[in-house]
Amino acid sequence: MKTSIPWVLVSSVLAFSCHLQSLANEELLSPDDSFNGNIDSGTFTPKTSATTYSLTGDVFFYEPGKGTPLSDSCFKQTTDNLTFLGNGHSLTFGFIDAGTHAGAAASTTANKNLTFSGFSLLSFDSSPSTTVTTGQGTLSSAGGVNLENIRKLVVAGNFSTADGGAIKGASFLLTGTSGDALFSNNSSSTKGGAIATTAGARIANNTGYVRFLSNIASTSGGAIDDEGTSILSNNKFLYFEGNAAKTTGGAICNTKASGSPELIISNNKTLIFASNVAETSGGAIHAKKLALSSGGFTEFLRNNVSSATPKGGAISIDASGELSLSAETGNITFVRNTLTTTGSTDTPKRNAINIGSNGKFTELRAAKNHTIFFYDPITSEGTSSDVLKINNGSAGALNPYQGTILFSGETLTADELKVADNLKSSFTQPVSLSGGKLLLQKGVTLESTSFSQEAGSLLGMDSGTTLSTTAGSITITNLGINVDSLGLKQPVSLTAKGASNKVIVSGKLNLIDIEGNIYESHMFSHDQLFSLLKITVDADVDTNVDISSLIPVPAEDPNSEYGFQGQWNVNWTTDTATNTKEATATWTKTGFVPSPERKSALVCNTLWGVFTDIRSLQQLVEIGATGMEHKQGFWVSSMTNFLHKTGDENRKGFRHTSGGYVIGGSAHTPKDDLFTFAFCHLFARDKDCFIAHNNSRTYGGTLFFKHSHTLQPQNYLRLGRAKFSESAIEKFPREIPLALDVQVSFSHSDNRMETHYTSLPESEGSWSNECIAGGIGLDLPFVLSNPHPLFKTFIPQMKVEMVYVSQNSFFESSSDGRGFSIGRLLNLSIPVGAKFVQGDIGDSYTYDLSGFFVSDVYRNNPQSTATLVMSPDSWKIRGGNLSRQAFLLRGSNNYVYNSNCELFGHYAMELRGSSRNYNVDVGTKLRF
């Protein structure tokens, strides 16, 4: 115990001494330390003493070295690490001229790092710019350059005559950026327009946007040049655009003269290489080994290589190099990447990837529900004996790679389609399809040393596409031919070169409907003969072509449940002179089954909308004409209707909404008969619960007549021949008031319907609906001798109403559209109910409430016959069938503003078992 005390004291002294030394090497930077060469009269003296600079506020250094270059970097450390702590503040360097030194900061000792951490803004702008002809970039380190936990980073307009236009280090780290990290318009007279490293770069775990824009290198790596293994991973947004290199790697170059560095790009939520340019190879990336796996949207777009012998429009792999592409959690797309041959008048050729001499693919795979799209071809040089297993998973485990590898000429222009190289992809190694799908579309050719297919995978090919081998056989166990492409009248081609090489096709011959709607195509509206499959070998077709295990009847995938129905038959022919065996397919049409989208009944259901509108107009005129305070005059009212019909297993639901205005007039005769006329203009919208909607305009009119009469049963009995005692006659009422009303209405509707099919072109159709309606009603008003507090008059009512609506025939405008025959709706109903009225003549405010039970005693439901525009196939379409019993509740209120003006409102609700209808009217009347 005694001997331990001195050692404790010694350790404490040493630790305290080290702490004091650390404090001595830390310097605070405050806003007072800022420098502006345009304002400050003195000169800036480079700082070289501290190893750590900690900011206490926002600091800037603007144009130090103006007029006379600085003797060294603004900050320099020659023996230790150099660290800047932002503490949430900003640090800005602008227009620095440090002569032959790095403009902002440098750490010159091997394995000692230059680190910036914790800034709200870190900016290096033109420090130095290209006007400093001896510039050496803005940051330099013999160890690593680390940029950590920075909210916003700007590295722009910097220049170096050496490597790394902005940043040069043994390594580079960018991590923890939460805002925007921008590297733009930096340039190097050698390599690495923005960044150059000898031991690799790591750009990882940035939750903001990392962008490299318009950086230029005079040799390689327009944005980044690395000679060591580099990792770009787990970034939210990584974007390279407009970068350029005079030799290789328009955006990134990752090679070393001696050694095999690897570039690993993985799990970036968005990764885009766009419009980058190189003059030798790799418009976007040139690497010895590249492993690219998607973490989201990944795209190579419009990258270009321009030289006498350009290679790799988007990606170039060095000789004996390796490439792995894996679509893990997002698609990977190569589109419009090109090669331009200088000195040639030919248009640029499409190219996605070039594999250098004796290089190889190690992985080409896509996880389930993801795709690698090659709209530009792949080229390969030399040979490799290693088998490329497309969509290959780990041995002994469930294969997760059941996605799609797609080669397509879909995006080629008409001129580009004339160039065979734009359609041909080549692998100079054996290829095996282990899982998922390999699709060849739009005229492409895929060439490999040999080709084989494992169970559970699908090789899908368009008519006019080719699968060929240069030195091996073709073995296919599950071939699918895209039915949509059969109209080209060109066969799918399988070609095996070499006298002893075979083509073996077994299993199902699938006719694939990729879009799921091909049998809607008019190509199948009649019997057809298609060229299906052509197999070519170099010798002895009878021996080297084996289709003995191929199921002779083609299988539809998926089955054609809707569209044109028919049967497929395949016939084979053999030509020994050309060593070919060819299959033709015969389609025999048997019928047509419309899809649910084509069976949309909205056209028929617009008749129910007209039915609703004309009845609402009649109710408005009836209620408005017979109200307590309604005397002769002119009136105007708004009118709004809403009808909703729920669907069932046989018919889809729909809804109708309309609104507009009504103008009318009322007059009384000397005998107190009432005449009312009205005109309406409505705007309506009908929509089914599917894909169609209709807009319409309705013009309508109505004429209402009401005759009031009082029966006197006692006088009739006294004057009649029947002999009643006076006491018996006195038991009858002295007077019985009656009211008989008659109403006739008409309307015309102009309709314009749009149908937005999920897989067919949009179609439009226009037609008109005509409507005639009428009704007869009988009222028996009673004034209660003991009035209820809520109403004074009770009026039993009974009506007979008829509505007839006709829909004219028409055809939709598109070739995929339909024609509709004439449709009709006829409905005869008998409403029975009563009205309760509160108010007397002379009252300024009155209201009433009515309730009816409505029975539709006769109905002809709307229906029509639909016919395809391009063929005579037709089917019945039946409109909605509203319940035949309804409860109708109506109310109105009237307010006499003065002797010449009256305000009124009407409300109605009709409830049926499968529908509901609401109506609201608000208006005013000028009386005279």
UniProtKB/Swiss-Prot annotation:
Q: Which residues form a coiled coil?
A: none
Identify the PROSITE patterns for this entry. AUTOTRANSPORTER (PS51208)
Where in or outside the cell?
A: Secreted, Cell wall; Cell outer membrane
Q: How does it sit in the membrane?
A: Peripheral membrane protein
Entry keyword set: Cell outer membrane, Cell wall, Membrane, Secreted, Signal, Transmembrane, Transmembrane beta strand
Q: Which family does it belong to?
A: Belongs to the PMP outer membrane protein family.
Q: What is this protein called?
A: Probable outer membrane protein pmp11
Gene name per UniProt:
pmp11
